[in-house]
Amino acid sequence: MSLKKSPFFELRSGSVDTLLFIVKTADLDALRAELVKRFEATPEFFADDVVAIDVRRLADNERVPLDDIRGMLSDVRMRAIGVVAQPEQHAWAAGAGLPLLEARDRRAPSPKAADDAPAQPEEPRVPAAGQAALFAQAGPSGADAVAPPAVAAAPVVAAQSATLVIDKPLRSGQQIYAKGDLVVLGPVSYGAEVIAEGNIHIYAPLRGRALAGVHGNHDARIFCTCLEPELISIAGIYRTTENPLPADVLGKSVQIRLEQEKLMIEPLRLT
C-alpha cells in the first residue's frame, strides 16, 4: 500500500469534545419524563448538539435500550454519536450500533464501588464537552444558591494554558473555546457561547452561555459584570433561565463558583 499523501483527504489521530448525557437510572419512563420537563419549553436550547450517551453510572446488573435513549434525545433535538461505558458494559452497549467512545476524564465509579469506598469529598465529575460541558450531573434546580456578597477575587489555581482574550462582541451562533482562562471584553449575545477549561471573566453583559471548568475543574469560576445568561455551568453543573435568577444578582456584577456540587452566585463589590 502506498504511503504517499493524498491531496484529496487525510486520516489522522484526533479528539473531539462533546456533551455527555449521563444516564443514572434504568427507568426509561422517569428518564423520559425528566427530559420533557426540562427541555420541552426550550426545544431550541440544545438544537442539533451532538452527545455521547454515558452509561457508567448504572449498576452492574442494569441495562438500558440505547436505541430508546437515542430516540428520547432526538425528541429534544440532540443527536447521539456514541456510547461511553465501563469495560464490563461494552458487550451490551455496543449492540445499539453506536461506537464505543473513550472519555478523557476519570471514569465514573459504579454504584457498588461508590458504596464500598470510604467517605471522602466528591471527586470531580465527568467533564463535559467542548461546546457544553455540563449536562446531566445537575440541572436547573432550587439547589443552586445565591450567597452573600463576596470580594471580587479569583481563586488561586494551578497554571494552565495561556489566557485567551476576546475584545470583540460575540453574536448569536459564535462560540469561543479557551484551553485555559478566558477574558471577554465585549457582550456575549443570546445564542453565543463561551467555554473555558479554566475561569471565565466577562466585562460586559452575559446573555448567552458561559461554561467554565469544562474538563472537570471544580475550582473554576465565572466572573461577569452583568448577568443575564441563557446558561451558566461549572464543571458540568449548570443552571438555565428555566430557573429564574433572583433580583439581587440578575443584571448585576457577580461571581459564580461551586460549593458542595451547587452553583453559588455571589454579588461582587467592585467599588
UniProtKB/Swiss-Prot annotation:
> What functional role does this protein have?
Cell division inhibitor that blocks the formation of polar Z ring septums. Rapidly oscillates between the poles of the cell to destabilize FtsZ filaments that have formed before they mature into polar Z rings. Prevents FtsZ polymerization.
Q: Name one GO biological process term.
A: regulation of cell septum assembly
Tell me the subunit arrangement: Interacts with MinD and FtsZ.
Task: Please state which protein family the record places this protein in.
Answer: Belongs to the MinC family.
One Pfam family name is: MinC_N
Alphabetical keyword list: Cell cycle, Cell division, Septation
Q: For the region Disordered, give the residue spans.
A: 106-125
Give start-end positions of Low complexity composition bias: 110-119
Q: Which organism is it from?
A: Burkholderia thailandensis (strain ATCC 700388 / DSM 13276 / CCUG 48851 / CIP 106301 / E264)
Gene (name only):
minC
Q: Which InterPro entries match?
A: CAP/MinC_C, MinC, MinC_C_sf, MinC_N, Septum_form_inhib_MinC_C
PANTHER family on file: SEPTUM SITE-DETERMINING PROTEIN MINC
* Database matches in SUPFAM superfamilies: Cell-division inhibitor MinC, C-terminal domain
Name-wise, this protein is: Probable septum site-determining protein MinC
